[in-house]
Amino acid sequence: ATGMATGCASSGQESGKSKLVKIAVCVSDQTPAAKAMTDVFKPMVEEATNGKYDLQIYNSGVLGSEKVTYDYTKSGIVEVCVVGTSMWSETPKMAIPDFPFLFRDVEHARKSYQGELGTYIAQDLESTQPLKLLSWFPNGARAFSSNKKLESLDDFAGQKLRMPNNPIHVKLAESLGANVVIMD
């Protein structure tokens, strides 16, 4: 399972009387994380602040890749980002949620993120980066997609798989015998 984190920098642009808050979401607007941002987070913040903030959500990576939007958030170009594993290179503990078979199910992952594990990882991120971790989104189990049926471990041998630039995911696929093509 992969934890998706939302980070927040402190700068922003003014938009009329409301402060414009740009939120970069690298996944499709049809995913649970994007829907949570649009359907829950945005109205909750706007209502709780009486319109002080105008949250503009940019889904599907329109503001850039995870790494780009993470860097934008650190530099204040974007106020909030929803990203997966792009934070690892600078904060290695962010890799912990990516280990295979770490969580029994989504509820176990959620409790772990909201408990000691999530606090431990967030404190490390916040002590090394100019960010504040606002929330975790369990991203489900790792799945492999292929035009060829992958019904047994033998089916992975020589299978070309596109993978995110994530050493844990890549090593898992390679250990199954797949030929990995890294996507950035």
Question: What spans do the regions from the language model cover?
Answer:
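Periplasmic binding protein-like
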Residues: 65-84
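Short, well-ordered beta-strand segments
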Residues: 22-24, 56, 81, 162
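Short helix-capping segments at alpha-helix termini
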Residues: 46-53
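Short helix-initiation/N-cap motifs at beta->coil->alpha
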Residues: 57-71, 164-168, 181-184
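Extracytoplasmic "Venus flytrap"
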Residues: 22-39, 60-64
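Contiguous mixed-secondary-structure segments that line small-molecule binding/active-site clefts
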Residues: 39-46, 79, 84-183
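Short, low-complexity disordered leader/linker segments with a strong preference
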Residues: 1-20
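Second-shell loop/turn segments in exported
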Residues: 27-31, 57-60, 108-110, 158-159
